[in-house]
Swiss-Prot record:
Its main location: cytoplasm. Pathway: Carbohydrate degradation; glycolysis; pyruvate from D-glyceraldehyde 3-phosphate: step 2/5. The lineage of its organism: Bacteria, Pseudomonadati, Pseudomonadota, Gammaproteobacteria, Candidatus Pseudothioglobaceae. Belongs to the phosphoglycerate kinase family. It comes from the Bacteria. Its EC number is 2.7.2.3. This is Phosphoglycerate kinase. It catalyses: (2R)-3-phosphoglycerate + ATP = (2R)-3-phospho-glyceroyl phosphate + ADP.
Length: 391
């Protein structure tokens, strides 16, 4: 990746506009999870230390575009930033005409999606954002797969467009995994449907040594082996695709599973061989023998990419597979990277964050990178670094 890096620039007295991912959960006007906010702090501190005028922008939630509302306001984020930075971070509601501020100050611009044209990457809106700054910093990997005004358009027209430390670190870690992985390379792809992860499965099958499937996805592969999956979530129309993937790549399909009769927290768990699932069963986790097999694979791996749980880990009786898998990844000597919302929830739940080498902040962006797709927000930074002029 050849882009301009924030760390290489003189920020003194400059107007620095930083696009961050501050899309956090909020309840009763209080931030309930501040991980993304804390992840943004080093970049902010770098700019403040150099005496820049620091403007932050982010989206939050899915408001009706162009219609400001308290429900999706970033005010609670500004409050939490003020606490973490030990300085006042004011929320700027009317910011498109420029922000009056002093060197060494930081303001948070209200939700970018309150501006009509944000999602459509409107050129006029992008130019107005660009006029606000001397330097635009893209530091939100989680939105890098979206070509929107605050992630892409502004980078076309800002005097300087660069990558922040968070984005650079993310791309470096993912590049390490995909470009020159230590072998054997193992990928775990979980989730409910093959159809939503089909491109990822196809892309990874070409580069990994073993492809582990979990969750509802695994049911389609079990069915592809000719076994009954009962009432389990299964995409029978994709069985031919599952068979092809198994021909192209080593895919250890579960040999035993944990079933229930209904999807509920109180459902009774029954462990069965994959060959013995009855018509009224629903598969919710992998069984103990399959867990042992996966733990051994993790132990011997050189590189691990983890995207998605292997069972319904929200219900304790169906959580053993994901719990044991997570701990096996944590204990492995392999270089490990985890990404995706459900995956990160599992990492949190089992307290293994410090033992995963890299935790990706992106959901959709993480998947699209694994698919080999070009991320628009990164591509525009590369174009600007190479001298392409959009003015």
């Amino acid at each position: 990746m050849s882009v301009i890096n924030l760390l290489d620039l003189d920020l003194s007295s400059k107007r620095v506009l930083i696009r961050q991912d501050l899309n956090v959960s909020i309840s009763n006007w209080i931030v309930t999870s501040d991980k993304r906010i804390k992840a943004s702090l080093p970049t902010i501190k770098i700019a403040l230390k150099q005496g820049a005028k620091v403007m932050l922008m982010s989206h939050r939630g899915r408001p009706i575009e162009g219609e400001p509302s308290d429900e999706f306001s970033l005010q609670p984020v500004a409050d939490r930033l003020s606490e973490l930075l030990n300085t006042t971070v004011r929320l700027e509601k009317d910011w498109l005409n420029g922000v009056q501020m002093n060197n060494g100050e930081v303001v948070l611009c209200e939700n970018v999606r309150f501006n009509a044209g944000e999602m459509a990457n409107d050129d006029n809106l992008s130019k107005r954002m660009a006029l606000m700054c001397d330097i635009f910093v893209m530091d939100a990997f989680g939105t890098a797969h979206r070509a929107q005004a605050s992630t892409h358009g502004v980078a076309k027209y800002a005097p300087i467009a660069c990558s922040g430390p968070l984005l650079s670190g993310e791309l470096d870690a993912l590049g390490k995994v995909l470009d020159n992985p230590k072998r054997p390379m193992v990928a775990i792809v979980g989730g409910s449907k093959v159809s939503t992860k089909l491109t990822v499965l196809e892309s990874l099958s070409k580069i990994v040594d073993q492809l582990v499937v979990g969750g509802g996805i695994a049911n389609t592969f079990i069915a592809a082996q000719g076994f009954n999956v009962g009432k389990s979530l299964c995409e029978h129309d994709l069985i031919p695709m599952a068979k092809k993937l198994m021909e192209d790549c080593e895919i250890p399909v579960p040999t035993d599973v944990v079933c229930g009769k209904e999807f509920s927290e109180t459902a009774e768990a029954q462990t069965k061989a994959s060959t013995e699932v009855s018509d009224d069963d629903m598969i919710f986790d992998i069984g103990p023998e399959s867990i042992k097999q996966l733990a051994k694979i993790m132990e011997n791996a050189g590189t691990i990419v983890w995207n998605g749980p292997v069972g319904v880990f929200e219900f304790e009786q169906f959580a053993s597979g994901t719990k044991t898998l997570g701990k096996a990844i944590a204990e492995s000597d392999a270089f490990s990277i985890a990404g995706g919302g459900d995956t990160l929830a599992a990492v949190d739940k089992y307290g293994i964050e410090d033992k995963i080498n890299y935790i990706s902040t992106g959901g959709g962006a993480f998947l699209e990178f694994l698919e080999g797709k070009i991320l628009p927000a990164v591509e525009i930074l590369e174009q600007r670094a190479s001298g392409v002029d959009f003015a």
